[in-house]
């Protein structure tokens, strides 16, 4: 346990240092590329501030993707609840910087003349590579942010909120062509290029590996299916899962997991559960206050339905 605690402390320290080092690096490259010098003039100063806010936003945007990629060392060191809180803070900060970046760039290119802002936006969209895609990505991120506000989130089912949240990945992906084609800081030096490509590759790789491939591989390997559904009380339902060699499935009693019921409508929605019986026992029971919601949307999962389960624990 002492060794695990030491490893977790080291992971938290390295994560914090890496976050700040990344922001310092992109700031350094901005300065080296004349960012501070450009502040001497009105128009160039606005676009220069637009560039640095865009760099900070892009860096934090990819960091928050990494934070919620289900990377086991991060999950173990911070815990999912704490990671979610950090993700929320970093995400909103990145979004505010993104909006600031857009406003400063548009006003800077319009030379501070509000009367030509609309024509400037049209010029950027039609004559600068990747800008239209970037606007589309921004629209996706705006939708994610709006649905993340507590007042809006309370009105949404968890499954619907989770599905809408996935559009954030589309928003991130649509920003890449803009950085490649018009972002001078992205390609200004070999070091900057290596840094950005490494950050993009790390974000994409961890998401594909831990959020997509691993759940699918585990579901195929362990052949998870619904063995039965038992109503425990008015608002609690137990879903019993069965499968192949569940003693090797790295899940523990008390753990939070997401389950998708693949062979029924609504299979794209992840349903949150807590695992009540350890994998490897005759059945793995998952309890959640979800029965009434299923009855009115996707239907209560029936025995035999194929499942995809996502959850991570430290390997023994």
Could you tell me what each predicted segment is?
Residues 309-316:
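A short, basic/flexible loop-to-alpha-helix module at the beginning of a structural domain
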Residues 4-208:
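Membrane-embedded alpha-helical bundles of multi-pass integral membrane proteins
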Residues 50, 216-306:
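Ferredoxin-reductase
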Residues 57, 257, 314:
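Short, flexible micro-motifs
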Residues 157, 191-198, 209-231:
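Canonical alpha-helical transmembrane segment with a positive-inside/aromatic-interface signature
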Residues 95, 262-264, 312:
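Short, surface-exposed secondary-structure boundary micro-motifs
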Residues 1-2, 244-245, 249, 312:
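Short, intrinsically disordered terminal tails adjacent to the first/last structured region
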């Amino acid at each position: 346990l002492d060794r695990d605690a030491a490893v977790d402390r080291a992971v938290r320290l390295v994560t914090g240092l890496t976050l700040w080092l990344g922001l310092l690096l992109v700031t350094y490259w901005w300065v080296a590329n004349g960012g501070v010098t450009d502040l001497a003039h009105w128009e160039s100063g606005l676009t220069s501030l637009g560039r640095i806010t865009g760099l900070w936003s892009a860096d934090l945007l990819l960091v928050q993707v990494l934070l919620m990629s289900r990377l086991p060392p991060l999950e173990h060191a911070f815990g999912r609840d704490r990671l979610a809180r950090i993700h929320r803070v970093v995400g909103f900060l990145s979004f505010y910087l993104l909006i600031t970046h857009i406003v400063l760039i548009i006003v800077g290119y319009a030379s501070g003349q509000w009367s030509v802002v609309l024509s400037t936006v049209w010029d950027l969209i039609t004559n600068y590579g990747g800008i239209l895609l970037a606007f589309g990505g921004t629209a996706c991120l705006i939708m994610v942010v709006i649905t993340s506000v507590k007042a809006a989130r309370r009105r949404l089912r968890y499954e619907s909120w989770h599905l809408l949240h996935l559009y954030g990945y589309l928003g991130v992906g649509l920003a890449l062509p803009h950085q490649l084609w018009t972002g001078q800081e992205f390609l200004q030096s070999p070091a900057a290029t290596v840094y950005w490509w490494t950050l993009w590759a790390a974000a994409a790789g961890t998401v594909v590996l831990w959020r997509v491939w691993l759940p699918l591989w585990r579901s195929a390997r362990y052949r998870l299916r619904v063995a039965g559904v038992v109503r425990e009380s008015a608002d609690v339902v137990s879903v019993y899962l069965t499968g192949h060699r569940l003693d090797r499935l790295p899940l523990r009693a008390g753990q939070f997991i997401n389950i998708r019921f693949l062979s029924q409508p609504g299979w794209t929605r992840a349903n949150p559960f807590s695992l009540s019986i350890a994998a490897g026992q005759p059945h793995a029971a998952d309890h959640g206050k979800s029965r009434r919601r299923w009855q009115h949307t996707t239907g209560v999962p029936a025995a035999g339905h194929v499942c995809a389960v996502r959850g991570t624990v430290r390997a023994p």
